Amino acid sequence: MALAARRKVRIRLYGTNPADVDQVAREIVDLAKKMGVQVRGPIPLPTRRLVVTVRRAPSGQGYHTYDHWEMRISKRLIDIEASERVLRRLMTIRVPDTVKIELQLI
């Protein structure tokens, strides 16, 4: 295969369920290794923690009690030196609704 046909692809995975993110990352790495391309990752990126504090009492009277709601966003990064054939195979991977994928050609 010609060198011009190979490109580096940066894949960013993120989602609220870390098990789903890890499972999709494992599938991508296994597919890339099976096809014989160079893979770097999955690299765990810092988990983003979103916290929302709300007052329990709707009227403002009474005790000052608060609820804390939290959502954690897990992220993984994978670099692949891939050809068009590998990218087509990557598109066939089933991805849960809780996982989002960004592809970037570098």
From Swiss-Prot:
Gene Ontology CC: small ribosomal subunit
Highest taxon, organism lineage: Archaea
Gene3D superfamilies: Ribosomal protein S10 domain (3.30.70.600)
A Pfam short name: Ribosomal_S10
UniProt xrefs under PROSITE patterns: RIBOSOMAL_S10
Protein family: Belongs to the universal ribosomal protein uS10 family.
Listed GO MF terms: structural constituent of ribosome; tRNA binding
Function, in words: Involved in the binding of tRNA to the ribosomes.
Name assigned to this protein: Small ribosomal subunit protein uS10
Self-association state and partner proteins as the record states: Part of the 30S ribosomal subunit.
Residue ranges that the Swiss-Prot or TrEMBL entry lists as coiled coil: none
GO biological process: translation
Organism annotation: Pyrobaculum arsenaticum (strain DSM 13514 / JCM 11321 / PZ6)
InterPro entries: Ribosomal_uS10, Ribosomal_uS10_CS, Ribosomal_uS10_dom, Ribosomal_uS10_dom_sf, Ribosomal_uS10_euk/arc
Swiss-Prot/TrEMBL keywords: Ribonucleoprotein, Ribosomal protein
